[in-house]
Amino acid sequence: MSEDNSQGREYTLEADSELRFEIEQKNAKVLVTLLTGFAELFGTELVKKKKYEFGVGAKVAIFTYQGCVIHVSGQMDVCYISKETPMVQYINCHAALEQFRLEAEQRDKRGPSVLIVGPMDVGKSTLCRILLNYAVRVGRRPLYADLDVGQGAISVAGNVATILIERPASIEDGFAKTAPLVYHFGHKSPSGNSVLYNAVVSKMAEVTLQSLDANKRTKSSGIIVNTCGWVKGSGYEHLLHAARAYRARAIFVLDQERLYNDLLRDVPANVHVVLLPKSGGVVERSKGLRHESREQRIKEYFYGNARTPFYPFSFEVKFQDLRLYKIGAPPLPDSCMPIGMKAEDNKKKVVAVTATPALLHHILTLSFAESTDDDVIGTNIAGFCCVTEVDMERQSVMLLSPQPRPLPPNALLLWSELQFMDNHA
């Protein structure tokens, strides 16, 4: 049931409580102003008297350690104050990480690598945001690695990515995503190609751990790693692989005791495994909502948002000028493989893709690799384009791209199973 609060209402929050609201109406707009006291949104402090605007899809939890008064106006689907919040436990986790960072600083060692794990819809990316914000507020410069290919907090879904966090996230837009390191995966779940997923995670971990050494402040700040919500069977094996690859010092487990106990059993004794509750404000998303969220991120990549609109380009590329590949060949039994190769090597093989009508709506990744002889898996990507039309008569495709024509010389495009219906007016 929606709550029409167009005239505005003041909410008085006691210490250690939070105001939660959700917006699901398509054109709804909610304005929030901190009137007195101190409050924060996922670790970012609100500025007094400044109006913050939230739109459709927003799930907001404004927390206060000391008490505050907040003015809210607009149409919300849910709005309430809760005193049951795990924020005190989350700040205790930050304090423990800060202790690790101080030790690393004194000994000129790398700061802690921390994995945030748990099933879907328990607030993993929110906890990452809180811990990163708290870190930069005390002068740290941590790295943020996102291994969740199903949603994509840094890049679009289907990729793993890392960024350097130098300032707190914007209340309305999140972290600035400048100069990310992004590796192509091409699937919405690690199950799409488990061998490739582990290879991409290993490469990302290797490169980012080395990059810590380039700057003293970043070195001691460490890495916060967001993971997928697939935690059983092969998904659990992927978590263990990520913990090894990133040399995890701590693993924070959200809301699943079984996963917590499995990790206690399977990771080295020097890794701190901590069980944390999820926030009562976390909302479970249906498959449809998760799909909408993916689509929205892709749309924002091409078109921006209401505050910062982008104007992408559309241009034709002939089939003969398309250098299109995918990573992972169809599986073959070991007996059919060349001598010295295993079937799993085929999962990392770069194979040519023929342009057909099946390409329509697919996202293509533009790689910085110039040929298939390069390390395509371990090469950063330049960006994305979307196939909006396939013309078999003209032997051409229409591409939606943030950059004007032509494609860069020697452009190597990688196929992704991600699709985007470009119906932008």
UniProtKB/Swiss-Prot annotation:
User: Where in the cell does this protein reside?
Assistant: Nucleus
Give the coiled coil ranges: none
Q: Which residues bind ATP?
A: 18, 59, 121-126
Cellular component (GO) terms are: mRNA cleavage factor complex; tRNA-intron endonuclease complex
Which keywords, in A-to-Z order, does the entry hold? ATP-binding, mRNA processing, Nucleotide-binding, Nucleus
Q: Which GO terms describe its biological process?
A: mRNA 3'-end processing; tRNA splicing, via endonucleolytic cleavage and ligation
What's the name of the protein? Protein CLP1 homolog
Q: What is the phylogenetic placement of the source species in the record?
A: Eukaryota, Metazoa, Ecdysozoa, Arthropoda, Hexapoda
Q: Which gene encodes it?
A: cbc
